[in-house]
Structures are given as C-alpha cells and as structure tokens.
Amino acid sequence: MADQLTDEQIAEFKEAFSLFDKDGDGCITTKELGTVMRSLGQNPTEAELQDMINEVDADGNGTIDFPEFLNLMAKKMKDTDSEEELKEAFRVFDKDQNGFISAAELRHVMTNLGEKLTDEEVDEMIREADVDGDGQINYEEFVKVMMAK
C-alpha cells in the first residue's frame, strides 16, 4: 500500500511523523495519531482513529512506527478518492467542459497549483494517462490514473 505513495508524499508524512515523535525513538503514541493526521488535512473521528490504531498496532503496545504510519496514510488517502471527488477534479481540469483534458488545460491547472512544468513534462503526463492515444485524457483515463496513485 505505502509503495503507491510518491517520494514527495513520503517526505511530507515523515516530516509530520517526526514532529510528533517527541523522543525520536521512531514511534508515536496512539494519542498523537489524531493530531498527526489532522496536520496532514485528514479529519478522522474518534471511532475511526480507534479502528485505525487497532488495525496498525499489531502488538498492542500503544505506539505506531513509521512504516505502519505510512500504510495507514496510504490506505486513508485511497479511501478519500470517492467517485464524486474524482468527477469534481476532472471538471476542474476540463476547462471547456468538452469531456477531455488537453495538454493546454493540464498545463493551466498545474500552473495555478504552483507547478511550473515544461512542455515535455506536460506531454509526458498526458502520454502516461492517454490510454487510447488521442493526445488528451478522457474521464475513464483520468480515473485510472487517480486510482493508481
């Protein structure tokens, strides 16, 4: 599960994890888990936290190490990709609402997100997602890419 995270996500999670690993022993207590997840934009309920902790804390010692934490976050992030959120995200990229994301639309959104990409990088992103080879991304291709991350 954690192998589907990007290096950037892993670095971000490591940073957050370290903030709460007060004594630097590589473990955080179950109490701290909620705080860590909230700092990363997740909003788990108490019941969800308890379930996650029970799932992850195999030996029941009340602490979670970094590999366990990564698996937890990867699972949590996958769960948040609901159909409705994917449709909304696709609409954001598909500026002219023609049902396709073009290289220009992709570049526009990425620039607005603060990502300065070269034409080559944008073309590469399109190529990776463009299953039918028409030079743009349709909704099915978009969903495939989003679910694979």
From Swiss-Prot:
GO terms for cellular component: cytoplasm. InterPro entries: CALM/Myosin/TropC-like (IPR050230), EF-hand-dom_pair (IPR011992), EF_Hand_1_Ca_BS (IPR018247), EF_hand_dom (IPR002048). GO terms for molecular function: calcium ion binding; enzyme regulator activity. SUPFAM superfamilies: EF-hand (SSF47473). It comes from the Eukaryota. SMART domains: EFh. Ca(2+) 4 binds at D130, D132, D134, Q136, E141. Signal peptide: none annotated. Residues 8-43, 44-79, 81-116, 117-149 form the EF-hand domain. The modification N-acetylalanine is found at A2. Ca(2+) 2 binds at D57, D59, N61, T63, E68. Gene3D superfamilies: EF-hand. Ca(2+) 3 binds at D94, D96, N98, E105. Keywords: Acetylation, Calcium, Metal-binding, Methylation, Repeat. Pfam families: EF-hand_7. Ca(2+) 1 binds at D21, D23, D25, C27, E32. Calmodulin mediates the control of a large number of enzymes, ion channels and other proteins by Ca(2+). Among the enzymes to be stimulated by the calmodulin-Ca(2+) complex are a number of protein kinases and phosphatases. This protein has four functional calcium-binding sites. Belongs to the calmodulin family. This is Calmodulin-2. It comes from Oryza sativa subsp. japonica.
